[in-house]
From Swiss-Prot:
Transmembrane segments: none annotated. Pfam families: KH_dom-like, MMR_HSR1. This is GTPase Der. PROSITE patterns: G_ENGA. InterPro entries: G_ENGA, GTP-bd, GTPase_Der, KH_dom-like, KH_dom-like_a/b, P-loop_NTPase, Small_GTP-bd. Belongs to the TRAFAC class TrmE-Era-EngA-EngB-Septin-like GTPase superfamily. EngA (Der) GTPase family. Keywords: GTP-binding, Nucleotide-binding, Repeat, Ribosome biogenesis. GTP 1 binds at residues 9-16, 56-60, 118-121. GTPase that plays an essential role in the late steps of ribosome biogenesis. The lineage of its organism: Bacteria, Pseudomonadati, Pseudomonadota, Gammaproteobacteria, Moraxellales. It comes from Acinetobacter baumannii (strain ATCC 17978 / DSM 105126 / CIP 53.77 / LMG 1025 / NCDC KC755 / 5377). Associates with the 50S ribosomal subunit. Residues 351-435 form the KH-like domain. GTP 2 binds at residues 183-190, 230-234, 295-298. Residues 3-166, 177-350 form the EngA-type G domain.
């Protein structure tokens, strides 16, 4: 098991920046706003052949109510999961009462704790750090996370008792099925994640935009590995005023590309809006397998349910291959039925077929319904092979195949879907026109052959003149 290291501290001391330095990524949103990081965030990291998991937490704030109090509960959960705790303080701001309160709570846990003083750049370090000795946690490790200064030395100290990996490849194994939960703000994404996980893992708070980061959560179900990605709620670009929300949109789009399957959550009570369709469009551009979850289905009248179903059939007619589920994430109704559709979409997206079988299906399809003619000549499709997975990509070679019209492309897509029972994934078909490999090449002959050719030509011309007489 990889050891877990939790970054703990009050808001805006630089935990997310330190997280990025440790994991060598921009996984945690970084901006100069207190309370920006609202959930536990997991990241894999390796330093000097030592693999571990880093958990970035929301700051333990001084507010007693609302979301700040909920953030504190999330941080405490992360502390319980951790093997090692890095307690981050702000060298510029100095020792605050909230730092002392956190230190008192941490000392009661019996875990290995390292005190890290961040933002030591631009201050007299020795003078600034004296007061932190009052916390009784020994000498603070000095870092300037925004510049990466002191981070390597900190890791050497923190990881000194962690053994090196016996087999580094073991830590690079597949994370399992990566599942991204996407949707507009406040449609119930975090509630669905909590229901899927069976624990109160991400902040599910009645406030649009509560989840600002994409959170990667590894878990197992019935012996199968998953990584659940809870994405930030995506607003229309016109309504994105805060820099934080712009960051979150980027994170959502990145999470789509990182996922194997995307679950698009739609609010049944608000109906399908343009932003829902835009999100599906983004997922299609990323070529991701997809399952639609119509949430908040409970407590709707029979008339509203009927109208919702009609709206779904009408607005989602461009993705007839996507499974649609009517669920209530809050009460768990229909949530368990998502898994079979997710698995089917994943299997379809990772289709692998030999070129011989694909070519046979292509030949059967063209025999049954011939390709159209282009400039008086019929398109000739010769053979097909797989060009990739997720999405399944089929490459067709032949003469003038790049001129294939859209309706015949759809016909071929439907044939492949029917034969291999592909559900929940877009199918990409690429056409490559066969080229004459000798086109543009000049014949290269030796001098002897060239001389013989000239003699034959002269002899032919003499015979032709003699015949004309």
């Amino acid at each position: 098991m990889k050891p877990v290291i939790a970054l703990i501290g009050r808001p805006n001391v630089g935990k997310s920046t330190l997280f990025n330095q440790i994991t060598k990524s921009r996984d945690a949103l970084v901006a100069d706003f207190a309370g920006l990081t609202r959930d536990r965030k997991y990241g894999d990291a390796t330093y000097q052949n030592k693999s571990f998991i880093v958990v970035d937490t929301g700051g333990i704030g001084e507010s007693e109510g609302g979301i700040d109090n909920y953030m504190a509960e999330q941080s405490k959960t992360a502390i319980n999961e951790a093997d090692i705790i890095i307690f981050v303080v702000d060298a510029r701001a100095g020792l605050l009462a909230s730092d002392e309160q956190i230190a008192r709570e941490l000392r009661t846990l019996g875990k290995k704790i390292y005190l890290v003083a961040n933002k030591v750049d631009g201050v007299h370090a020795e003078a600034a750090l004296v007061e932190f000795y009052k916390l009784g946690m020994g000498e603070p490790l000095q870092v300037a996370a925004s510049h990466g200064r002191g981070v390597q030395q900190m890791l050497e100290d923190v990881l000194q008792d962690i053994p090196e990996d016996e087999n580094p490849e073991e830590h690079d194994k597949d994370t399992g099925l990566r599942l991204a939960i996407i949707g507009r703000p406040n449609v119930g994404k975090s509630t669905l994640v909590n229901r899927l996980l069976g624990e109160d893992r991400v902040v599910a708070f009645d406030q649009p935009g509560t989840t600002r980061d994409s959170i990667y959560i590894p878990f197992e179900r019935e012996g199968r590995k998953y990584t659940l990605i809870d994405t930030a709620g995506v607003r229309r670009k016109g309504k994105v005023d805060e820099m934080i929300e712009k960051f979150s949109i980027v994170k959502t789009l990145q999470a789509m590309k990182d996922a194997h399957v995307v679950v698009v959550v739609v609010d049944a009570r608000e109906g399908i809006v343009e932003q829902d369709l835009h999100l599906i469009g983004y997922a299609l551009e990323a070529g991701r397998a997809m399952v639609i979850a119509i949430n908040k289905w409970d407590n709707m009248s029979e008339y509203d349910r009927k109208q919702c179903k009609l709206d779904v059939e009408r607005r989602f007619d461009f993705i007839p291959w996507a499974r649609i589920h009517l669920i209530s994430a809050l009460h768990g109704t229909g949530v368990g039925e998502l898994y079979p559709s997710i698995h089917r979409a994943y299997e379809s997206a990772n289709l692998k077929v030999s070129p011989a079988k694909l070519t046979q299906i292509l030949n059967d399809a063209t025999d049954q319904h011939q390709p159209p003619t282009v400039q008086g000549r019929r398109i000739k499709m010769r053979y097909a092979h797989m060009g990739g997975q997720n999405p399944p990509t089929i490459v067709i070679h032949g003469n003038k195949v790049d001129k294939t019209p859209a309706d015949y492309r759809r016909y071929l897509e439907n044939v492949f879907r029917k034969v291999y029972k592909l559900e929940g994934t877009p199918v990409k078909i690429e056409f490559k026109t066969s080229e004459n490999p000798f086109e543009g090449r000049k014949s290269q002959v030796d001098e002897r052959t060239a001389a013989r050719r000239r003699r034959y030509i002269q002899k032919f011309k003499k015979a032709e003149k003699k015949f004309k007489r």
